[in-house]
């Protein structure tokens, strides 16, 4: 687990890889005496989402079988997405460093990349346009996953 790793859209963050099984990481985490909490969410009659919360900072959502679906980071992360976006950036900086911004599903996506997004905090999570966000709003959470299916027509 490395808080300095590059944020790779739809692929990985902090040394965890989308699509891999969480069970391949747990022995290492326990050996390092990292705090790991697990919460199970029901998603319909037969599907469950398992969330592993690591050091109260990284949240990894997995399928019932342990496949990593997405990874979110809050509070502390030093790596960057494409060497330009990072945790703690302002909305104004995102606008100035990217060509296109889209708000969907309470999240801010950039440059039509649907593998990385910033989560909009309350009360801004119901806003539809980036122009309606305060320019000095600090973005304190991001998610890496494979969200392309959300945007298919």
Regions found by a protein language model. Name each.
Residues 1-153:
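Short helix/turn-capping signatures at newly exposed starts of structured segments
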